[in-house]
């Protein structure tokens, strides 16, 4: 289980599903152990869809130094996790037809079941089991026209990520 301790003092607990996406879970846990997510904020907020984090630059273009293989149907992996509310999935470069192995450190959390259109094209690998109210508060932070938060606040800043 992963815990995001937000700068606001709130927490988000996420259960991982290595039986569906073992390489993705292994990579995510490694990044947590290394402190990679500490001090990073949720840089993209799309109300009714997703909140996205894991980019050390905060621009949507950064990541870790290592890409991982896509663990989803379009990449040849039978991942049965559906992108429903609370599901954790890897963001990646590319589209529905290319860039399958470009996931690195950026991730998103689904805000509702409208994310099911992503099934088979993005590696879902966990689910929020406690703190969905925190996720929903993050989703309500004001954004600009590019879905970026207008300012980095304690509500969207991950103070520390840990394995619990």
Language-model-detected regions and their locations in the chain:
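Cyclophilin-like peptidyl-prolyl cis-trans isomerases
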Residues: 1-164
